[in-house]
Amino acid sequence: MPELPEVEVVRRGLETILKDQPILEKVELMRKDLREPIPAKKISTLVGQPLTSIERRAKYLLLWTPKGAMLSHLGMTGTWRVAVPGDERLHDHIYLHFSGDLRLAYRDPRRFGCFDFVQDPLKHPKLADLGPEPLEAEFNGPLLWEKLRGKDVALKVALMDQKVVVGVGNIYASEALFAAGIKPTLPARKLSLERASLLVGEIKKILSQSIKAGGSSISDFAQASGESGYFQTSFRVYGRDKEPCVTCGQQVKSKVLGGRNTFWCSRCQK
């Protein structure tokens, strides 16, 4: 599933494509639903409006007009691309037609994404209860430490709780914990303030590095330009079960935590 870096890379790509604030001329839905029903009538109220900005909140994209926004979640396999005439593909579910003969296509083979209407982000059920953005200044060691107090779940599971911090999914939780030298199975409530501050620093560093690298292209992820990211070539533990640790040479371990495969080095991470 695309995590924060991948969604931010898509946002930046779309922002470049739509920089001239084109008018939304038509929303063409090839089906009535993705993971959930698409509110076609509400979204149709945005037709005729200029696209004023593209924002990201957690793993959601918000395409803003003066009357509201289209909200997009990429799910497991969703991608946005410019689709010139004749470029219609299997599993294209949404076409956004803009002035200047510009057309964006949303393709999602597994249909785990969503496409929704937003007027007030603070009141929208998908956005209202989200935690802090990890790359913002407000996300710091004391805040993370406070949010983890009393949590008996494994630290890695807690990091993937979108009420604790948004956008840190399976890949980047494993990588950040390795960089900070903290084992993923540590009960979240036992993380010290000092180590929380260290972990926050590594989360920020790794997310920033991945964005710069265009994200991690595993499964179907691609940038809005169609290019792949290449941060996956920098993975130090993720997906490296039974391979030698890049730091100490000990075999990397894996375990399912919170329903997701987790990777770590038992020598380097305590």
Swiss-Prot record:
A zinc finger (FPG-type) spans 236-270. GO terms for biological process: base-excision repair. Keywords: DNA damage, DNA repair, DNA-binding, Glycosidase, Hydrolase, Lyase, Metal-binding, Multifunctional enzyme, Zinc, Zinc-finger. It catalyses: Hydrolysis of DNA containing ring-opened 7-methylguanine residues, releasing 2,6-diamino-4-hydroxy-5-(N-methyl)formamidopyrimidine; 2'-deoxyribonucleotide-(2'-deoxyribose 5'-phosphate)-2'-deoxyribonucleotide-DNA = a 3'-end 2'-deoxyribonucleotide-(2,3-dehydro-2,3-deoxyribose 5'-phosphate)-DNA + a 5'-end 5'-phospho-2'-deoxyribonucleoside-DNA + H(+). Binds 1 zinc ion per subunit. DNA binds at H91, R110, K151. The keyword Metal-binding applies. HAMAP family: Fapy_DNA_glycosyl. Belongs to the FPG family. This is Formamidopyrimidine-DNA glycosylase. It comes from Bdellovibrio bacteriovorus (strain ATCC 15356 / DSM 50701 / NCIMB 9529 / HD100).
